[in-house]
């Protein structure tokens, strides 16, 4: 009578193999994008042009500095 025994080494190999298989990346379907019309503008603005024009002295920062002064905290 023969019996099959599974050793810890064999179990470890099976676990490592499963982990390796799970690390594969999921493949996504190819997306179809519409063709661009001839009259469309090449320079599309996708963000605000004035992003760095914000003032550093906003109403919030003024109120915060005032509250810190009231609390006795030094302000740089």
Curated annotation (Swiss-Prot):
Family annotation (SMART domains): DSS1_SEM1
Compartments (UniProt record): Nucleus; Cytoplasm
Biased amino acid composition, Basic and acidic residues: 7-20, 57-70
Record keyword Nucleus present: yes
One annotated GO biological process: epithelium development
Alphabetical keyword list: Cytoplasm, Developmental protein, Nucleus, Proteasome
Region entry Disordered, spans: 1-28, 52-76
One GO cellular component term noted in the UniProt record for this chain: proteasome complex
InterPro entries in the cross-refs: DSS1_SEM1
PANTHER family tied to this protein: 26 PROTEASOME COMPLEX SUBUNIT DSS1 (PTHR16771), 26S PROTEASOME COMPLEX SUBUNIT SEM1 (PTHR16771:SF0)
Assembly: Part of the 26S proteasome.
Entry similarity comment: Belongs to the DSS1/SEM1 family.
Function text: Subunit of the 26S proteasome which plays a role in ubiquitin-dependent proteolysis. Has an essential role in oogenesis and larval growth. Required for intestinal function and default lifespan.
Designated name of the protein: Probable 26S proteasome complex subunit dss-1
Originating organism: Caenorhabditis briggsae
